[in-house]
């Protein structure tokens, strides 16, 4: 090989390495770009942006074209490198007593390592990092050439795509032609947490976004005020009784029932008092002002509950269980508080649901298990209960009295029983047969000898 051929071969290798870089940059920039960004730029951008949009609409096809281009340029680089390496002089190796065969093998090895390393760095790694760091700018530079290459080699790309899809189907998997751009709520929650840890989102914003995304996974049963906490009025009660009930309970909405909550005929709001002249309130029945009330099943998801509650006259719905009995009531305030946290007004109890107390926490028995976990760090095992009082009742096996204590099993971050950490629950206050207030204490290892189950 003369000098001219050698120079031409080196230039060809450099050009092929650059070609590999173009295909790698096109592949990574197209996968890094978000669909919404591509569409927005195509509407108000240049012809290059419309090329990017065209490529993004056939992403699987373009990625296959990029892979084919990478394979062709890499193979061509190896093909040109081999005769060039064979011509490399090695008199120094022969001079030290090394045979021609060993010298040829050694020089070929080192030459291939150098060429391969340069090709990997400049043909693959550098373009990849550029594309990931600046996907839009990179795509504008390389995608037009990528689209043209894929157009010219369409038959070959379709052939390789068809063969690959056939093999994947034989493995029992249906090939996906495009990358999935949508994300599940769980994936979005994970992204929010990662963004908060990296400092891209402040903690308050991340907390609000996380609760908003998790809202749809909750059910009406988890969102409602339970039946035992509802104050109802009878059909023969009057507006004056509504005033008295509002003053005594601090509530603003009341179901109107015939006998009990399983026969709810409507809903009234304390603001409706002002629709009736003061002199008529003592003998105006609630049924004359009651509004129809929406009814939702206890298994309905949070988003659907929100839609029905917002559409109802007084933004309230009754929740029924699988047997048709009333399980509770859900209001718009309940739903908003699930997203933004407690919204307290002058009628609410000033005592918060969770209060730090010494080495533990005093918590309302009505708190859900996930709310307890968020507030205290205690993660309960799965079971047939929704609230912390339900868990304690299950562990005790009977209706407790104030002062009873039970040891609770905790789960670790992976959802496995954590034998290194135990929790002690003490009943502080009962409301009839319902646990109204509990104290949770975190203990290391096992409970002390004076504590136990059902003491």
UniProtKB/Swiss-Prot annotation:
Coiled-coil ranges per UniProt: none
CBS domain location: 224-285, 286-346
Domain CNNM transmembrane: 2-205
Residue stretches spanning the membrane: 6-26, 68-88, 106-126, 148-168
Subcellular location: Cell membrane
Protein name: UPF0053 protein MT1890
PROSITE patterns in the record: CBS, CNNM
Topology in membrane: Multi-pass membrane protein
Primary localisation category: membrane
InterPro entries reported in the protein's UniProt record: CBS_dom (IPR000644), CBS_dom_sf (IPR046342), CNNM (IPR002550), FAD-bd_PCMH-like_sf (IPR036318), FAD-bd_PCMH_sub2 (IPR016169), Ion_transp-like_CBS (IPR044751), Transptr-assoc_dom (IPR005170), UPF0053_domain (IPR051676)
